[in-house]
């Protein structure tokens, strides 16, 4: 259903532009510039023209993926220090970095010796460093303004996704590989392990005879470390927006790769078309258009491959109302979550959002789009239950998938082969 869309008056837009120019030009030294964009959510549904660059990147050339060579052209973004700080590591179960991996060959450490990227007996995981960044975000009419800076400019700049239960972290570690549950019941991010039917599945799918829903996935994450979190929430919102910033497009599959969004086969013996976690070369990003290959964004196959839906209990849909957890509080009742005031009643591709402080944007149903317009990703809704969010997409959903795709149609206990989970680790908190 299309609702009335509010467009700001010209005088308001001119005042906003004046404040944007003042902010981005005068406040910071050049070594820590503000990078910014405005997404014209309602007035332009073309994913390749609705993003306007502002600030230090006003005249930048965006990044672009060569789908044939699978190589990223960094455009004007190659020297961004935040992007350079995104490196692959092996870390202990509590988020301390043990050593750095060769960014172009994960089977090697940075010093050239063999790594533990495929060693399930290693006491830790293969993860990717996401350095803290500050974000300012607001709406003017249906234009969404987003600013990023590596230092806190003022109180409006928040470390969205880096606040863990009230403690701001210097970095977060995102999974390089889809979550798998090992023989000790621990959630892992290790190459050479299956995610489908170890970190997902109903009782008949799994040799243990145990259905793996949200509670079971959380238990596996917590068994590895009490610091462990689901890969979702505010940080994924921040990373999705950075993808838009880097590519100057809201069609992230077209910009970064289509992953494994169309590999499904109706055969449990073949893991329903999913694949075992595999080391993918090519550096920080790897993209393809065949819809049948592991891809990666920020060294993470989970972000780029769309093979299995990822449980994200930091967003719930309670009888049609979106509730969120900005600081990774885990509460499947939603009683302690923030009420966004946003209602969703039906499935759809949504072009507009509402900005939620400390969390990022959530979809609104004011304007419906498609797999080729707006944010290009689909949202499934059941407004009659308490639903737990899933993110990214699965290998049976094709162009419905993407970093803005969500399933808000299943309860926490819903266990299915395609509903998996991966772990997120915060940097150890300062004493």
Can you describe what each PLM-predicted range is?
Residues 117, 121-124, 151-304:
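Short aromatic-cysteine micro-motif
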Residues 318-329:
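A short, polar/charged loop-to-alpha-helix boundary motif
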Residues 1-26:
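Short, low-complexity N-terminal tether/leader segments at secretion or assembly junctions of large
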Residues 114, 286, 407-408:
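Eukaryotic intrinsically disordered and solvent-exposed regulatory patches
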Residues 35-43, 237, 258-273, 279-281, ...:
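C-terminal, surface-exposed recognition/capping segments
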Residues 136-138, 181-182, 238, 309-310, ...:
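Eukaryotic short linear interaction motifs
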Residues 25-184, 224-230, 234:
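Extended N-terminal export/anchoring regions of large proteins
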Residues 294-320:
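Extracytoplasmic, non-cytosolic globular domains
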């Amino acid at each position: 259903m299309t609702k009335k869309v509010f467009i700001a008056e010209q005088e308001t837009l001119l005042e906003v532009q004046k404040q944007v120019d003042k902010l981005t030009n005068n406040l910071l030294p050049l070594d820590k510039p503000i990078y910014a964009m405005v997404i014209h959510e309602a007035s332009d549904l073309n994913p390749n023209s609705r993003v306007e660059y502002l600030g230090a990147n006003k005249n930048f050339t965006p990044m672009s993926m060569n789908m044939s060579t699978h190589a990223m052209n960094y455009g004007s973004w190659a020297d961004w220090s935040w992007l350079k700080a995104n490196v692959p590591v092996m870390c202990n179960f509590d988020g301390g970095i043990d050593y750095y991996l060769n960014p172009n060959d994960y089977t090697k450490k940075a010093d050239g010796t063999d790594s533990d990227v495929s060693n399930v007996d290693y006491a830790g995981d293969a993860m990717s460093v996401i350095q803290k960044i500050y974000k300012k975000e607001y709406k003017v009419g249906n234009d969404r303004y987003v600013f990023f800076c590596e230092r806190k400019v003022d109180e409006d700049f928040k470390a969205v996704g880096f606040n863990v239960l009230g403690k701001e972290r210097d970095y977060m570690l995102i999974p390089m590989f889809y979550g798998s549950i090992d023989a000790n019941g621990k959630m892992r991010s290790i190459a050479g392990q299956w995610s489908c039917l170890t970190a997902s599945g109903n009782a008949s799918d799994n040799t243990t005879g145990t259905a793996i829903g949200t509670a079971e996935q959380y238990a596996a994450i917590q068994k590895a470390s009490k610091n462990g979190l689901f890969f979702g929430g505010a940080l994924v919102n921040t990373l999705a927006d950075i993808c838009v910033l880097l590519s100057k497009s809201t069609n992230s599959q077209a910009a970064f790769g289509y992953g494994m969004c169309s590999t499904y086969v109706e055969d449990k013996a073949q893991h329903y078309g999913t694949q075992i976690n595999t080391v993918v070369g090519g550096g920080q990003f790897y993209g393809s258009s065949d819809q049948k290959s592991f891809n990666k964004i920020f060294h993470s196959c989970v972000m780029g491959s769309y093979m299995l839906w990822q449980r994200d209990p930091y967003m719930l849909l309670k009888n049609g109302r979106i509730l969120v957890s900005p600081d990774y509080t885990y509460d499947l009742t939603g009683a302690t979550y923030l009420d966004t005031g946003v209602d969703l009643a039906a499935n759809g591709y949504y072009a507009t959002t509402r900005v939620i402080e400390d969390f990022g944007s959530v979809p609104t149903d004011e304007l419906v789009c498609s797999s080729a317009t707006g944010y290009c990703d689909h949202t499934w809704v059941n407004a009659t239950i308490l639903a737990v969010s899933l993110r990214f997409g699965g290998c049976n959903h094709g162009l419905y998938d993407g970093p803005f795709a969500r399933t808000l149609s299943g309860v926490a206990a819903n266990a299915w082969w395609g509903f998996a989970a991966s772990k997120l680790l915060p940097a150890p908190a300062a004493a």
